[in-house]
Amino acid sequence: MSRGAAAALPYVRRRAPGGGSPCGAGGAPGPGGPRSGGGDGSHATCPQGDGSHAKCPRGAPIGAPSGHNGRVSTTSLPSPDHAAELRSALLAAGFTADGLLDLLGAPAYAALARSETVPALRATRGAGDAPLAVLVRLFLLQQSVPYAHAEAALPVGVALADGWLLREGESVRATVDVRPYAGPDADADAGDGTGGDWFVVSDLGCAVGGAGGIGGRGREPGTEVVLGVGGASTTLAGITVPLPVGSALDLGTGSGLQALHAAQHATRVTATDVNPRALEFTRLTLALSGAPDAELLTGSLFDPVGDATYDLIVSNPPFVISPGARLTYRDGGMGGDDLCRTLVQEAGAHLNPGGYAQFLGNWQHVEGEDWHDRVRSWVPRGCDAWIVQRDVQDVTQYAELWLRDAGDHHSDPAEYARRYEAWLDEFEARKTRSVGFGWITLRRTDAAEPSIVVEEWPHSVEQPLGGTVLAHFARQDYLRRHDDASLLEGYFLLAHEVVQEQVGTPGAEDPEHVVLRQNRGMRRATKVDTVGAGFAGVCDGSLSAGRILDAIAQLVQEDPVVLRDRTPEAIRMLVEQGFLEPVAHPEG
């Protein structure tokens, strides 16, 4: 199978040609946004493909069998006591992200991301009772398999005793979903020489998300479902800064994906959730992935950690703006976007100096109010911020999205209409016209003049973006330290991923316009004039900005003083957006 084909599939370590993003973390080539299961815009309902797009709801359970009855584990959860032995068996059978791709092939693997399992069932049927095929049927397709076949694939006695499997006569079935996963930092060592071959453990039928098709059937009353890996969670993992840190907090951990990533570069990891079952699933995810244990605390928002501070805080919170807290995994129990606001406002007090907090969120677009101002007002004192809106939905689209997620579109038409009305009543009462989706990153700086960038970027991006986030704040530091005069004394390098495009009539002496375009990261594009294009093209770090402008002034026969006076703003923009990188003086 070609590496290019692999790039369109979720949860696979293989990279596209040219060092593309790991699949499932989001990336090129589709136009970018929060919630797809595919890493490159390949999700059937997501034109953007980084997991944050509004049209890719949590309610698209990957791998839940067609016609699945929505059964969720009702027995006590498995014990992690022999997780290392089970992990060894799974890896020996090739039950990894890449192994799945090799077994199923690209079409069947991609179909799982669309909740279509027939192609995968056919593929495993052809593999007979091979251990990998048996494990796929057990843990991904959630089929009962003959005891003898399971015995050949894994230590079935241990799996039964510890509660991973349940025996039914001469067959066994899985009690939880176990999903191979390889994320943005999957090249990290898991401690056993297997690199980033990880496993995320969640409730059956909930590998990616949503209550649609679950509806509480097969669950004890009051049992809260715990979802597995979804587009939103892989997006957050992809934008998280890749820094070695002393302490990390995964707030609202769910099945533990962010805690698993944090464990690769944090000395100490704390994970919290209001749902005690989620913490048990996190324990299983960490153990089965060969990751260190985390501190697991029950409670809402920052309540469980008191006044503790961290170097890194991450959260994929229950941010859905809904008329009631029906589903804990998505509804935070606060009105409107108050949960996201509270999370952002309180995060600053829990960050160590230089620490980062990164969240996904929703925010209301309220009549008579600029949404930029709304979310900017959330930023706590002492923090820089970068807030990126990736998508917007009007209130009808938003309501329909989450009604489908909850499976309400399968309910009685009158009940569906009643619930739809409740959503619209809620939005009308709050004067909400639409809802934005996006990313929020804070950095604790205690600067006198904080940098707060709030922007809309609904276009294609290439994950992972953690390094891009770090570079953004480094550039903000540079610009904060340099006024226009010192900017002209600086040295710059055209970023290696930037290309120049010229558009104009064939045969014309000059182009109508020139565009600088990034082919990696945020994939920004900006129109520049001939001076800007010439300036950027000459920036190789050997000449100061002022000397370059003086040379250009001679070429275009312009007063160098005038050119120096009007150009710093353009240089500042090119630096801020990552087209130019500040470098040290070539002579030190």
Model-derived features: where do they sit?
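Long, charge-rich, low-complexity alpha-helical segments
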Residues: 130-177, 235-238, 268, 442, ...
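Conserved Class I SAM-dependent methyltransferase catalytic core
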Residues: 274-275, 336-389
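Flexible, glycine-/basic-rich loop-and-beta segments that form/coincide
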Residues: 395-473
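Conserved SAM/SAH cofactor-binding pocket of Class I
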Residues: 222, 230-315, 321
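Compositionally biased, low-complexity flexible segments
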Residues: 1-67
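SAM-dependent Rossmann-like transferase core, predominantly class I methyltransferases
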Residues: 168-248, 253-261
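Mobile active-site "lid"/loop adjacent to the S-adenosyl-L-methionine
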Residues: 276, 317-342
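Acidic, low-complexity/disordered tracts enriched in E/D and polar residues
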Residues: 68, 73-134, 179, 183, ...
